[in-house]
C-alpha cells in the first residue's frame, strides 16, 4: 500500500504542479460537453 502511495505522489520538485495534476483528468469531460453544446447549436446535423 505504501508503494502505491509513493507512486501516486509527485516528486518534491513538482509539488507546485499538484493542483494542476488534480484538475487535468477533468479536461476531456469539458471537450465532451463542448461537442454536445456545439452539436446542439448546429441542430445535431
From Swiss-Prot:
Pfam families from the UniProt entry: PsbK
GO CC terms, sorted: photosystem II reaction center; plasma membrane-derived thylakoid membrane; plasma membrane-derived thylakoid photosystem II
Gene Ontology process terms (BP): photosynthesis
Keywords: Membrane, Photosynthesis, Photosystem II, Reaction center, Thylakoid, Transmembrane, Transmembrane helix
Location in the cell: Cellular thylakoid membrane
Residues passing through the membrane, by range: 16-40
Disruption phenotype: Grows more slowly than wild-type both heteroautotrophically and photoautotrophically, approximately wild-type amounts of PSII assemble.
Topological relation to the membrane, as annotated: Single-pass membrane protein
Propeptide position ranges: 1-8
Similarity remark: Belongs to the PsbK family.
HAMAP family referenced in this protein's UniProt entry, alphabetically: PSII_PsbK
Function per UniProt: One of the components of the core complex of photosystem II (PSII). PSII is a light-driven water:plastoquinone oxidoreductase that uses light energy to abstract electrons from H(2)O, generating O(2) and a proton gradient subsequently used for ATP formation. It consists of a core antenna complex that captures photons, and an electron transfer chain that converts photonic excitation into a charge separation.
Assembly description: PSII is composed of 1 copy each of membrane proteins PsbA, PsbB, PsbC, PsbD, PsbE, PsbF, PsbH, PsbI, PsbJ, PsbK, PsbL, PsbM, PsbT, PsbX, PsbY, PsbZ, Psb30/Ycf12, peripheral proteins PsbO, CyanoQ (PsbQ), PsbU, PsbV and a large number of cofactors. It forms dimeric complexes.
Protein name: Photosystem II reaction center protein K
Organism listed in the record: Synechocystis sp. (strain ATCC 27184 / PCC 6803 / Kazusa)
Record gene name: psbK
Amino acid at each position: 500500500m505504501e508503494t502505491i502511495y509513493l507512486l501516486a505522489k509527485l516528486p518534491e520538485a513538482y509539488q507546485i504542479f499538484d493542483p494542476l495534476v488534480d484538475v487535468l483528468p477533468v479536461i476531456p469531460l469539458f471537450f465532451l460537453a463542448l461537442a454536445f453544446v456545439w452539436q446542439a447549436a448546429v441542430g445535431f446535423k
